[in-house]
């Protein structure tokens, strides 16, 4: 591999192209093209950059359309138990953090090749009600044995033969929605998320750390998130259920004397 790297001088450096256009804070367009160190730019396996990302994001276009995302985007609802592309703090920070305030869709404008959705999403607003719908279809890197996916590859590197053998092997289709009612003192949301992996079944090799990981071809998650507050008390959280039997709940109570 070391000799192979020196036989392609263009592999010794990473390349990044990023273009962004914004108008009146309501229209955002972006393009990202990236090649990691060690990845060829042009050969029989690679044609140009290794990673491309494009998005068009519209905000507050009229009184009903709150947001529209086409291309690559991120999602966050509730406390993130069912779905969130937000940064996740450590355990200690989680205890003292306030409730999440980024509910809805945002553009994906980074070189992270995994933590995003690709498709379309929209938020429609009516009075105190937000209705969010989204659809995504992506090809993921993974270790495949026949129709079994034993692992996912998430580093985004495609330099070696073993990397190329795992590149874009597994299709993932995701769709769902969120309905949110919000007033100054009360907020409640309902989220549903369905995802499937084409003809593949996710079956990671059993290890102590992955005993409770999802296994199978498709899954469904639903959750309810809530926030109740006044001058003295703030209670918020999210409780989620999964079709494979998993249950999760994250709640916090803050008192202000």
Give the positions of each predicted feature.
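Residues on the lipid-exposed face of transmembrane beta-strands in outer-membrane beta-barrel proteins
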Residues: 17-21, 54-58, 70, 115, ...
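Short, small-residue-biased leader/transition segments that mark boundaries at the very start
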Residues: 1-13
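Surface-exposed extracellular loop regions of Gram-negative outer-membrane beta-barrel proteins
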Residues: 15-55, 89-96, 192-243
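Repeated loop/turn-to-beta-strand initiation elements of outer-membrane beta-barrel proteins
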Residues: 25-31, 62-68, 128-132, 185-190, ...
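Residues that define the transmembrane beta-barrel architecture of outer-membrane proteins
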Residues: 12-15, 48-52, 114-118, 171-175, ...
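Outer membrane beta-barrel
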Residues: 38, 45-141
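Outer-membrane beta-barrel translocator domains and adjoining extracellular loop/strand segments
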Residues: 40-47, 81-86, 143-151, 200-208, ...
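Extracytoplasmic loops and strand-loop junctions of Gram-negative outer membrane beta-barrel proteins
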Residues: 101-106, 157-165, 206-210, 234-235
């Amino acid at each position: 591999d070391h000799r192979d790297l020196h036989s392609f001088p263009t592999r010794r450096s990473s390349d990044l192209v990023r273009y962004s256009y914004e108008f009146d804070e309501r229209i955002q367009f972006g393009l990202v093209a990236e090649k990691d160190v060690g990845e060829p730019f042009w050969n029989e396996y690679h044609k140009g950059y290794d990673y491309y990302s494009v998005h068009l994001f519209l905000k507050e276009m009229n009184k009903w359309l709150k947001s529209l995302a086409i291309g690559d985007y991120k999602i966050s609802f509730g406390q993130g138990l069912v779905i969130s592309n937000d940064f996740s703090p450590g355990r200690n920070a989680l205890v003292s953090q306030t409730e999440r305030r980024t509910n809805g869709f945002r553009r994906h404008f980074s070189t992270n090749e995994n933590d995003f959705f690709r498709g379309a999403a929209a938020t429609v607003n009516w009075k105190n009600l937000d209705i969010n719908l989204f659809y995504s279809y992506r090809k993921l890197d993974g270790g495949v044995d026949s129709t079994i996916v034993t692992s996912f590859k998430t580093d985004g590197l495609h330099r070696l033969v073993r990397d190329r053998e795992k590149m874009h092997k597994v299709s993932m289709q995701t769709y769902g929605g969120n309905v949110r009612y919000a007033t100054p003192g009360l907020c409640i949301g309902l989220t549903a998320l369905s995802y499937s992996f084409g003809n593949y079944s996710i079956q990671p090799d059993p290890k102590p750390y992955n005993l409770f990981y999802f296994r199978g071809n498709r899954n469904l998650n639903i959750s309810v998130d809530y926030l109740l507050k006044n001058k003295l008390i703030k209670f918020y959280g999210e409780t989620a259920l999964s079709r494979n039997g998993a249950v999760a709940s994250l709640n916090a109570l803050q008192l202000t004397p």
